């Protein structure tokens, strides 16, 4: 299936790109999410005329996302959870919980689909989580999972000493 991107898509292309994609990917993801349109002759002519408008709109969205990224950057989210004796959580910390806590902290609604977890968080510790609000921009948030507030503070102190040691080694 041949499509024209009307929004930038990570690892695929930018606005106005004409691409061949698998039929299922186009029909089931790109078209319903309004990320692309079919590459028919009338649509190709239309996209040439409207490409500037799409790019201006994307630039405006990107500027807004950059402001939000500045708020998100270097956030530390602390989750207090019950655990077994070996530090395993009863359950897990989900992307929805991270999005909700982050939304509370910055007073801006973050969708759980913007929170990218490499793997589920099922034990205590410090994790880095990617927040992707735009195809080309992302921010990193530190998530601390602990049994108590004092344990969370210990993790923070431990992290600060590690970063100061790293800075001393690089100097």
Curated annotation (Swiss-Prot):
Keywords: Ribonucleoprotein, Ribosomal protein, RNA-binding, rRNA-binding
GO biological process, one term: translation
GO CC annotation terms, alphabetical: ribonucleoprotein complex; ribosome
GO molecular function annotations of the record: rRNA binding; structural constituent of ribosome
Domain of life: Bacteria
The keyword Transmembrane is annotated on this UniProt entry: no
Cross-referenced InterPro entries: Ribosomal_bL9, Ribosomal_bL9/RNase_H1_N, Ribosomal_bL9_bac/chp, Ribosomal_bL9_C, Ribosomal_bL9_C_sf, Ribosomal_bL9_N, Ribosomal_bL9_N_sf
Family according to the record: Belongs to the bacterial ribosomal protein bL9 family.
PANTHER family from the UniProt entry: 50S RIBOSOMAL PROTEIN L9
Function according to Swiss-Prot or TrEMBL: Binds to the 23S rRNA.
Name the UniProt record assigns to this protein: Large ribosomal subunit protein bL9
């Amino acid at each position: 299936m041949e499509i024209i991107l009307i929004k930038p898509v990570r690892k695929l292309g930018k606005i106005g790109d004409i691409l061949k994609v698998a039929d299922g990917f186009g029909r089931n993801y790109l078209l319903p999410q309004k990320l692309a349109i079919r590459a028919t002759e009338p649509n190709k002519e239309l996209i040439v005329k409207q490409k500037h408008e799409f790019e201006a709109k994307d630039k405006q969205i990107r500027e807004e996302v950059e402001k939000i990224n500045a708020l998100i950057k270097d956030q530390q989210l602390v989750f207090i959870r019950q655990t077994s004796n070996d530090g395993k959580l009863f359950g897990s910390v989900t992307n929805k919980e991270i999005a909700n806590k982050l939304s509370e902290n910055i007073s801006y609604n973050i969708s759980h689909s913007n929170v990218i977890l490499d793997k589920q968080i099922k034990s205590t510790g410090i994790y880095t989580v990617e927040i992707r609000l735009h195809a080309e921009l992302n921010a990193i948030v530190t998530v601390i999972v602990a049994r108590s507030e004092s344990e969370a503070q210990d993790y923070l102190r431990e992290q600060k000493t590690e970063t100061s040691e790293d800075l001393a080694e690089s100097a």
